[in-house]
Regions:
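Helix-loop boundary and gating motifs at the non-cytosolic
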Residues: 1-35, 223-248, 252-255, 260
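Transmembrane alpha-helices of Major Facilitator/SLC transporters
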Residues: 34-41, 262-276
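Glycine-rich segments within core transmembrane alpha-helices of 12-TM secondary carriers
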Residues: 35-39, 122-147
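Transmembrane alpha-helix termini and helix-breaking/packing motifs in multi-pass membrane transporters
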Residues: 46-49, 53, 78-80, 137-157, ...
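C-terminal ends and interior cores of transmembrane alpha-helices
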Residues: 50-51, 62-84
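Symmetry-related core transmembrane helices of the 12-TM Major Facilitator Superfamily/SLC fold
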Residues: 65-72, 154-172
Length: 276
């Protein structure tokens, strides 16, 4: 919940206060497409072991840690620049935050599914939503209030430090059992090309990227297209319209503290009530 607002509303408020045009701010919303299209690299996160980290932490936690390192580094990169003189640096950092955050979402969802039985999934989802929303309060209302008094560079630095809570959680959380290999005949393919490096690479890509989509389409047939369209477009309006709301609040003369209190405290607690 913390990184996503540094890609959307909190970022847009910072840019508008620094005099960046609404047109330029709108282009920053494209960074949020990482959340919509994260399904494209989720099979790699599911199947690809990270060197060294995979042995130390396991598949799920190693990817979570890598994503958090990317996010922390990107937040610190953004804090080192200002929109007036380093807009490209902030744009690059925003893309990195979005990619790292989306990857963290993939790995966290996989960890949650693997670590607990089905009867505990609803409880874990509720806990996940609570943590997600508290992160949004920190990156929304908290960041805006801090920026009101100490500037956005200070606020971003504090938020990067808060990400260390998640890093500590990675080391404290249990690692689920190794994910089971996908079926669908991929084991036979991998066995047939064993010893051929090019064939092994092609078989691995098939089992990691192609096979999950084939299994999904075979299982749901033409409904799969509707499901993928819904998943891809479900939050699209929020990403675009929500991103442009804060610049309008700033133009209307509201202070950052007022925007944070109304938009990112009262609204978030209403969402938390719904999660219960």
């Amino acid at each position: 919940g913390l990184p996503i607002l540094l890609v959307f509303s909190t970022l847009s408020a910072w840019l508008r206060l620094e005099g960046v045009s609404r047109t330029e701010i709108g282009f920053f919303a494209w960074a949020g497409m990482a959340y919509t299209f994260k399904f494209m690299w989720s099979p790699l996160v599911d199947r690809l072991p990270l060197p060294l980290l995979d042995r130390l932490l396991g598949r799920r936690r190693s990817w979570i840690l890598l994503a958090q390192i990317i996010v922390i580094g990107a937040i610190l990169l953004a804090s080192s620049a200002t929109p007036s003189t380093g807009l490209f640096v902030i744009a690059l950092a925003t893309v990195m935050i979005a990619f790292g955050s989306a990857t963290q979402d993939i790995a966290l969802d996989a960890w949650r599914i693997d670590v607990a039985e089905d009867e505990y999934q609803a409880l874990l989802v509720a806990i996940y939503q609570w943590g997600y929303r508290f992160g949004m309060i920190a990156a929304g209302a908290g960041a805006l209030v801090m920026a009101d008094f100490g500037g956005f560079s200070f606020a971003y630095t504090v938020l990067a430090a808060l990400m260390l809570i998640g890093v500590a959680g990675v080391f404290l959380a249990p690692e689920p059992a190794r994910p089971k290999a996908l079926g669908g005949g991929t084991e036979a393919i991998e066995g047939a090309v064993k010893g051929n490096p090019l064939g092994e690479a092609a078989a691995w890509l098939y089992s990691a990227v192609v096979a999950p989509f084939v299994d999904f389409i075979v299982r749901y047939r033409w409904i799969a297209l509707l499901i993928l369209t819904l998943i891809g477009a479900y939050r699209l309006n929020d990403f675009v319209l929500g991103f442009m709301a804060y610049p309008f609040y700033v133009d209307m003369g509201y202070t950052l503290s007022e925007i944070g209190a109304v938009s990112k405290v009262y609204g978030v607690f209403a969402m938390l009530a719904g999660a219960m």
